[in-house]
């Protein structure tokens, strides 16, 4: 339950820095400003104006730090409440001391995400926009940031609003039919009903179809580099990273541990996993590396299967293919700078394949493009118009809405009662409303906002 009290927290990262910010929100923010902040001029704080002065202990009168303070009078603030921000020096101890004085002056310590939760509860943003705030903070690539900013600015919410508008129109028609059962249903009204439902279903379907792309942009993907020893797996990792991260020698079995690094390909964050070469071996340490590799395979979204193009495939290659059965693969034929001796078997002919030379850098751009196109199918992710669902919560609720819309259309065709059809429309509308927060239970809100840091 939302309690209209006053909360406070440090909004900047812990540790040393140039500036530390203590944020206060609630009805007591103006009085707290007067108690803990001393400035040269007298009188009330003017809203949205920065003042220079000192943070003081209200009991002893001691100046704790020189600082800047700004009071933002509601509703023109992040939370739509009175908000005070004190900008002091960024040391760990001084910001903690300023926060303690603010708490002593009447505020309580904010819970994780409570400032953004208040912005949501006070109607400044919807739940999709609130969730986008944490995505902005955690974005690792420009594309992930752009997607998060689009959602924070309300692009996805606008699409969902059009869906709910269509469903409300449809529900209004059905309820009118129910209220006046003695009247024959006008064929034009029934056609309008069908149009409203199909428009809503089409938009929901488009959003669900874009989920996979949205998810990988927000979360990234795990790409495992697999193959037998000495085919160039570590060299491929180094080439993609453009640095010597993994040890490369001519001795088979050099890599015996798992190496993970992040690579950004056109805004797509990749968690690259370099693994030990897979083969039958009696070496105890190498055998442990092979075991770790096999354990990593299930968590990979994509496997780059590296083969040596200068040698024929052998039993080790076939054993690896068997271990990778059912995985999404790109066949990477390395060492194209040497005479080609490999023959691609029929079962691999249709597999995506890129020929590279890690020693010369040949084919690396083509490999990057192939990886990108595996997950992003031509979407203009840098476009101002790009909108995608990126959270499982959103996808599942939209899928539930689709289920009810499908049941509605089937029921309409089968002559179900209007009351039953109205139930399906209400349930479809409620599912979409839960995405934006119109109908979201408090326990779900707790889960969402608990993921935020304190101070946001």
From Swiss-Prot:
Hydrolase recorded as keyword: yes
Class of this enzyme: hydrolase
SUPFAM superfamilies linked: P-loop containing nucleoside triphosphate hydrolases
Cofactor binding note from Swiss-Prot or TrEMBL: Binds 1 potassium ion per subunit.
Gene Ontology cellular-component terms listed: cytoplasm; cytosol
Alphabetized Gene3D superfamilies for the sequence: P-loop containing nucleotide triphosphate hydrolases, Probable tRNA modification gtpase trme, domain 1, tRNA modification GTPase MnmE domain 2
Domain TrmE-type G: 220-376
Residues engaged in binding Mg(2+): 234, 255
Location within or outside the cell: Cytoplasm
Sequence positions that bind K(+): 230, 249, 251, 254
UniProt main location, coarse: cytoplasm
GO molecular function: GTP binding; GTPase activity; metal ion binding
Keyword Hydrolase: yes
Keywords: Cytoplasm, GTP-binding, Hydrolase, Magnesium, Metal-binding, Nucleotide-binding, Potassium, tRNA processing
Positions contributing to (6S)-5-formyl-5,6,7,8-tetrahydrofolate binding: 23, 85, 124, 456
Matches recorded under InterPro entries: G_TrmE, GTP-bd, GTP-bd_TrmE_N, GTPase_MnmE, MnmE_dom2, MnmE_helical, P-loop_NTPase, Small_GTP-bd
Pfam families: MMR_HSR1, MnmE_helical, TrmE_N
Cofactor: K(+)
GO terms for biological process, alphabetical: tRNA methylation; tRNA wobble uridine modification
UniProt-listed Enzyme Commission number(s): 3.6.-.-
Summary of the function given for this chain in its UniProt record: Exhibits a very high intrinsic GTPase hydrolysis rate. Involved in the addition of a carboxymethylaminomethyl (cmnm) group at the wobble position (U34) of certain tRNAs, forming tRNA-cmnm(5)s(2)U34.
Family assignment from sequence similarity: Belongs to the TRAFAC class TrmE-Era-EngA-EngB-Septin-like GTPase superfamily. TrmE GTPase family.
Subunit annotation: Homodimer. Heterotetramer of two MnmE and two MnmG subunits.
Protein name, as recorded: tRNA modification GTPase MnmE
Source organism (scientific name): Geobacter sulfurreducens (strain ATCC 51573 / DSM 12127 / PCA)
Gene: mnmE
């Amino acid at each position: 339950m939302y309690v209209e009290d006053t909360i406070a927290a440090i909004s900047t990262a812990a540790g040393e820095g140039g500036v530390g910010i203590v944020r206060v929100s609630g009805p007591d923010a103006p009085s707290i400003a007067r108690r803990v902040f001393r400035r040269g001029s007298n009188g009330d704080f003017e809203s949205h104006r920065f003042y220079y002065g000192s943070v003081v202990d209200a009991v002893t009168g001691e100046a704790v730090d020189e600082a800047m303070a700004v009071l933002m009078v509601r509703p023109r603030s992040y939370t739509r409440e009175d908000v005070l921000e004190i900008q002091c020096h960024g040391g760990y101890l001084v910001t903690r001391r300023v926060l303690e004085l603010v708490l002593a002056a009447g505020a309580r310590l904010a819970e994780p995400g409570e400032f953004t939760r208040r912005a949501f509860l006070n109607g400044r943003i919807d739940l999709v926009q609130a969730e986008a705030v944490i995505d902005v903070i955690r974005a690792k690539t420009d594309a992930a940031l752009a997607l998060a900013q689009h959602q924070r600015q309300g692009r996805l919410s606008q699409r969902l609003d059009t869906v709910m508008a269509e469903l409300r129109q449809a529900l209004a028609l059905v309820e009118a039919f129910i209220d006046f059962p003695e009247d024959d249903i006008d064929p034009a009204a029934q056609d309008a009903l069908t149009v409203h439902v199909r428009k809503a279903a089409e938009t929901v379907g488009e959003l669900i179809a874009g989920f996979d792309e949205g998810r990988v942009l927000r979360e990234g993907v795990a790409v495992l580099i697999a193959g037998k020893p000495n085919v160039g797996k570590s060299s491929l990792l180094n080439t993609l990273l453009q640095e010597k991260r993994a040890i490369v020698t001519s001795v088979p079995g050099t890599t015996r541990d798992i190496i993970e690094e992040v690579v950004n390909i056109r805004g797509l964050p990749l968690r690259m996993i370099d693994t030990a070469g897979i083969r039958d071996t009696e070496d105890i340490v190498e055998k442990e590396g092979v075991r770790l590799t096999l354990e990593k395979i299930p968590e990979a979204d994509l496997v780059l299967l590296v083969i040596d193009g200068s040698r024929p495939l052998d039993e080790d290659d076939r054993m690896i293919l068997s271990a990778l059965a059912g995985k999404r693969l790109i066949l990477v034929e390395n060492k194209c700078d040497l005479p080609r001796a490999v023959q691609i078997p029929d079962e691999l002919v249709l597999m995506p394949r890129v020929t590279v030379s890690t020693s010369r850098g040949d084919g690396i751009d083509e490999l990057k493009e192939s990886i990108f196109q595996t997950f992003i199918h031509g979407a203009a992710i840098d476009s101002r118009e790009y909108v995608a669902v990126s959270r499982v919560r959103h996808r599942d609720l939209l899928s539930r809405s689709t289920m009810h819309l499908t049941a509605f259309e089937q029921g309409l065709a089968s002559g179900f009662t209007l009351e039953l059809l109205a139930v399906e429309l209400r349930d479809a509308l409620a599912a979409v409303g839960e995405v934006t927060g119109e109908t979201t239970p408090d326990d779900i809100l707790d889960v969402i906002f608990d993921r935020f840091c304190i101070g946001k």
